């Protein structure tokens, strides 16, 4: 399984990457915003996307919308990991087609549970 981690904050990318590795997901790549991530998604055969919301260039919500609008990418599972905890933003992400939503700060257990739930829904 190949996972793309998108966040403009390199420390957060590293935290997510390390947590994913601890969960057994070792094949990861990183991008610092949606503008960088979208071409990587087109050429990289990714199986899963973890993205922040607030980033310069293309935001995570715009990246999510671009993924859902793309015939080749629209089935890609997307987990949003963000500080955006307002109800309106969670609803906006759900309406845009996000598969899971984690509010920062979070624990490894929360990340694990969200990823497992996404796979249950995608595979079930």
Curated annotation (Swiss-Prot):
GO MF terms, alphabetically ordered: metal ion binding
Keyword field: Chemotaxis, Cytoplasm, Flagellar rotation, Magnesium, Metal-binding, Phosphoprotein, Two-component regulatory system
Domain Response regulatory: 2-119
Pfam families: Response_reg
Disulphide-bridged cysteine pairs: none
Taxonomic superkingdom: Bacteria
GO cellular component, one term: cytoplasm
Co-factor(s): Mg(2+)
Transmembrane segments: none
A GO biological-process term: phosphorelay signal transduction system
Modified residues (4-aspartylphosphate): 52
Matching Gene3D superfamilies: 3.40.50.2300
CDD domains: REC_CheY_CheY3
Residues that, per the record, bind Mg(2+): 7-8, 52, 54
Cofactor: binding comment: Binds 1 Mg(2+) ion per subunit.
Cellular localization per UniProt: Cytoplasm
Chain's role: Involved in the transmission of sensory signals from the chemoreceptors to the flagellar motors. CheY is likely to be involved in changing the direction of flagellar rotation.
Stated name of the protein: Chemotaxis protein CheY
Organism: Pseudomonas aeruginosa (strain ATCC 15692 / DSM 22644 / CIP 104116 / JCM 14847 / LMG 12228 / 1C / PRS 101 / PAO1)
Lineage of the organism: Bacteria, Pseudomonadati, Pseudomonadota, Gammaproteobacteria, Pseudomonadales
